[in-house]
Each structure stands twice: as structure tokens, then as C-alpha cells.
């Protein structure tokens, strides 16, 4: 956990997590950031239960889009509505092409 918060004591060659944004969607916390030279971008998706991080998903140099499943009536067959609620912004700023991924909440 000290590495994630940036409080660990390491030499200068170690990776530094510099967060740029923190957003919350229900029990999921999204933290986006980059390294000091902005050559590596990352997104952490933490699932928090009763104040405890119970799951961590980590994405490096990936453009992440978060969607939320819409509610639908079970008795009818309709197109599933999955609106985008969050998109990573840092990969576009560092000027490189990265793979894209959708995280469904």
C-alpha cells in the first residue's frame, strides 16, 4: 500500500505514482495518473467494501472507458444501454497510441 500512496522509501530509479484525478462510482474508486516524465500512464480501479480496498485492477498505458449497465425490464427484450460514465484522459495528452479497454460497472 505504501507504493500506491507514494509514501514508500525507494531509490530514485523506482516508479512514482503521481495521481491526476480521483473519481468515485458507487463502491469503485478510479484513480488516474502518470509517472513524472509522463511517458507511462496508469489507471487504478479500486473496489471498496466497508472502508477496505477489496479488489485492485491496474491498467498501464491503456485508454480506459467505464460504462454502467442500464436497468431494463426483464419482461421486454430491448437493446442493452451502457452509457459511458468516465474516460481516461492522460493517454491522449502524452501523444501515443495505446490499446483501449471497457470496464463495465
From Swiss-Prot:
Ubiquitous. It comes from the Eukaryota. Induction: Mechanical wounding induces a rapid increase of this protein. In leaves, this increase is inhibited by the addition of osmotically active agents. SUPFAM superfamilies: NTF2-like. It holds the Pfam family WI12. InterPro entries: NTF2-like_dom_sf, Wound-induced_1/12_sub, Wun1-like. To potato anionic peroxidase. PANTHER family: OS07G0691300 PROTEIN, WOUND-INDUCED PROTEIN 1. This is Wound-induced protein 1. It comes from Solanum tuberosum (Potato). The lineage of its organism: Eukaryota, Viridiplantae, Streptophyta, Embryophyta, Tracheophyta.
Amino acid at each position: 500500500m505504501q507504493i500506491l500512496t507514494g509514501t514508500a522509501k525507494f531509490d530514485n530509479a523506482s516508479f512514482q505514482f503521481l495521481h491526476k484525478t480521483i473519481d468515485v462510482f458507487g463502491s469503485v474508486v478510479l484513480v488516474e495518473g502518470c509517472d513524472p516524465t509522463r511517458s507511462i500512464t496508469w489507471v487504478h480501479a479500486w473496489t471498496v467494501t466497508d472502508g477496505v480496498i477489496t479488489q485492485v485492477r491496474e491498467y498501464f498505458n491503456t485508454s480506459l472507458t467505464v460504462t454502467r449497465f442500464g436497468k431494463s425490464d426483464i419482461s421486454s427484450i430491448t437493446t442493452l444501454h451502457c452509457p459511458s460514465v468516465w474516460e481516461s484522459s492522460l493517454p491522449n495528452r502524452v501523444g501515443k497510441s495505446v490499446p483501449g479497454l471497457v470496464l463495465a460497472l
